[in-house]
A protein has these predicted regions:
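Flavin (FAD/FMN)-binding glycine-rich loop and adjacent Rossmann-like elements that form
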Residues: 1-160
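Disordered, acidic Ser/Thr/Pro-rich linker "stalks" and the adjacent N-terminal cap
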Residues: 147-185
Length: 185
């Protein structure tokens, strides 16, 4: 709960990347993407309920999805700190989209997976992100995460060589999507 009724955000941490509203509106695809969002930017007035005479909120919709880079989850000044949820590194307007629970959940899974993999590799999250981002992305896909624009590239994954069929399917959502690592768009 916010510290002021009617506000939907609290503190934000500064990461190695700050996601902006321009990136969201452009449906940006980042090379180090580990999560995604698609909720409209829901901007609430800074004063909350106390802001009399102001429009309480403004919604900016956009088509498609955007990706959230790893740098939004890694602290920019504390080497061994990661964040997830409503405190990721994003501008105030970008936070209007990233703060919804579905987006927070996929980001939390990415941050948790990265922290575990970094610990196993004996690296800080920041160092891990510089050298192991592809490995992290492939692990997230293997764990049934969706990252727009990324496909399963794991040569050891037998699903890549498998053949899938179904008696019926929705156009564009055939059984082959299960094998590609892109099961939903």
């Amino acid at each position: 709960m916010g510290n002021l009724p009617g506000t939907r955000e609290s503190r934000r941490l500064l990461g190695t990347h700050v996601l902006t509203e321009q990136e969201i509106l452009a449906n940006s695809r980042h090379a180090d993407a580990v999560a995604y969002g698609g909720w409209p930017m829901d901007e609430h007035v800074a004063g909350g309920f106390r802001a009399k005479g102001q429009i309480p909120s403004r919604v900016r919709s956009f088509p498609g999805l955007y990706t959230i880079p790893y740098g939004c989850y890694c602290s920019g000044n504390i080497e061994n700190l990661m964040m997830a949820g409503r405190n990721i590194s994003a501008s105030k307007l970008a936070m209007g989209s990233t703060r919804v629970m579905g987006t927070c959940a996929v980001g939390g899974q990415a941050a948790g997976t990265a922290a575990a993999m970094a610990a196993l590799a004996g690296l800080t999250p920041a160092a891990f992100g510089k050298t192991h981002i592809r490995q992290l992305q492939q692990q997230l896909l293997k764990d049934d995460c969706y990252i727009p624009g990324l496909t399963n590239q794991d040569p050891a994954d037998l699903a890549r060589a498998a053949r899938a069929s179904a008696s019926s399917s929705r156009p564009g959502f055939g059984p082959e999507q299960v094998l590609s690592g892109i099961a939903r768009t």
